[in-house]
């Protein structure tokens, strides 16, 4: 069973720039008496510039992948609830007691837990298993970042008028702000890489929103200039001696995904032709359709 972290086998490093297309608000905890301070401030660095917590981006990427993986009879969003296949926390507690009574090893328990996790938990992690995806905090690329203050008012659902005392300010990062993106994926399988690339394609097409008030149009972001380095232990050693690790653009890497499949259902030429027919502007829906046809709808392993 190759799901556990026995040894370093493969690492995926995704870099790029995340650009805000509309105002972005990721809130910070505020507790002050300054009457001039904004009611809902954005999270900031010590130097006052806003940043995007890696956990915030990881959360929306995971949520998007859950929606892609969901299908009738295979619902992943409610772990442990039928017909979900994912092991939930209470089941794990019972399993620990059972395995101890049977004097079974921790290794056996870990393998059992792995075998009963859904594809999303295997990639992004859960209470039972450390995730493979590591998203660093996204730092602003500009020395000075423009922030906007927007005035809002809550609406009473019954009267459809402004609720009393419900006027508040919302601080947002201005559109066009750039943040440096860095994602590491440790020991992913080929299927997990394909699933993650579909999610990144959606992010590059501006189809994933981030932060608060997304229903009101805030939080639209887009991944640009993405590069993917896919390397193993030998590549790490080669880099230590001055060698270069292979790196691809997102579009290039999507076209190469099927070439390392364990059991491709089409020839290399047919796969290249199918992906080339998509053109330079590949959407995640198109890529997902081709990859599912090639790999028979395989879900993340």
In which residue ranges do the predicted regions lie?
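RNA-binding basic/glycine-rich loop and surface signature characteristic of RAMP-family CRISPR effectors
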Residues: 1-154, 158-301
